[in-house]
């Protein structure tokens, strides 16, 4: 059976220097190739929402990105503001420092505060798996399952590494067959996307969506 790669893809542009023209191009590509969503920083949500109005492509906004180390109240506020501006999905970054400090209750409360402000808007929780042990990955995945979030997500693409097959498999095994798993960071070609899907990913975050659906090799510097 042929994989419909486009339906897996969150077409992504999160660079600090991304221009409005580049965001508009991202949205045009997403409409042309029927990607599931575009993923942008919250400041570009109004632009993306306007460009994608009337299309099937959803607008996803990152929150607390890329460090996840801001105040919980600020993350929750940003999520609500992004939704009010037109975001239809939210990708938040956990506070990795808190997790590594053993502040498990604070990490969970941080996620819950954002989830509560998302209401019916799907929330994806970014673990930054390259910085975590397997035990910590399982710990956060179990936390997210308990909080009934929509997805767990591997990476910001801004740290020391991106999605790895073994981490996606571990995340899928932990959350079970229903909850979403998003592989992001360093997924730049069709073969890698297929590996992640076979490992259990139900969404792919990438700046190389066009290359993936066309079977080409993207630039090595992409998200």
UniProtKB/Swiss-Prot annotation:
The active site is at 91 (proton donor/acceptor), 153 (schiff-base intermediate with acetaldehyde), 182 (proton donor/acceptor). Catalyzes a reversible aldol reaction between acetaldehyde and D-glyceraldehyde 3-phosphate to generate 2-deoxy-D-ribose 5-phosphate. It catalyses: 2-deoxy-D-ribose 5-phosphate = D-glyceraldehyde 3-phosphate + acetaldehyde. The gene is deoC1. GO terms for biological process: 2-deoxyribose 1-phosphate catabolic process; carbohydrate catabolic process; deoxyribonucleotide catabolic process. GO terms for cellular component: cytoplasm. InterPro entries: Aldolase_TIM, DeoC, DeoC/FbaB/LacD_aldolase, DeoC_typeI. The keyword Lyase applies. This is Deoxyribose-phosphate aldolase 1. Its main location: cytoplasm. CDD domains: DeoC (cd00959). Belongs to the DeoC/FbaB aldolase family. DeoC type 1 subfamily. The lineage of its organism: Bacteria, Pseudomonadati, Pseudomonadota, Gammaproteobacteria, Enterobacterales. Gene3D superfamilies: Aldolase class I (3.20.20.70). GO terms for molecular function: deoxyribose-phosphate aldolase activity. It comes from Yersinia pestis. Keywords: Cytoplasm, Lyase, Schiff base. Pfam families: DeoC (PF01791).
């Amino acid at each position: 059976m042929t994989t419909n790669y486009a339906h897996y893809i969150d077409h992504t542009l999160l660079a600090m220097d991304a221009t409005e023209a580049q965001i508009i191009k991202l949205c045009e590509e997403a409409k042309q190739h029927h990607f599931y969503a575009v993923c942008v920083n919250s400041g570009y949500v109004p632009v993306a929402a306007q460009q994608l109005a009337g299309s099937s492509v959803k607008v996803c906004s990152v929150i607390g990105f890329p460090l996840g180390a801001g105040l919980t109240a600020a993350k929750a506020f940003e999520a609500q503001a992004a939704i009010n501006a037109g975001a239809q999905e939210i990708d938040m970054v956990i506070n990795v420092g808190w997790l590594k400090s053993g502040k498990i209750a604070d990490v969970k409360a941080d996620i819950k505060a954002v989830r509560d402000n998302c209401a019916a808007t799907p929330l994806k929780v970014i673990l930054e798996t390259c910085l975590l042990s397997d035990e910590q990955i399982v710990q956060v995945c179990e936390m997210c399952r308990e909080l009934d979030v929509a997805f767990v997500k591997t990476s910001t693409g801004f740290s020391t590494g991106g999605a790895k097959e073994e981490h996606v498999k571990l995340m899928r095994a932990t959350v079970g067959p229903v909850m979403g798993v998003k592989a992001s960071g360093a997924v730049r070609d069709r073969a890698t996307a297929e590996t992640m899907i076979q490992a259990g990913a139900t969404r792919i975050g990438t700046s190389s969506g066009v290359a993936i659906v066309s079977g080409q090799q993207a630039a090595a510097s992409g998200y």
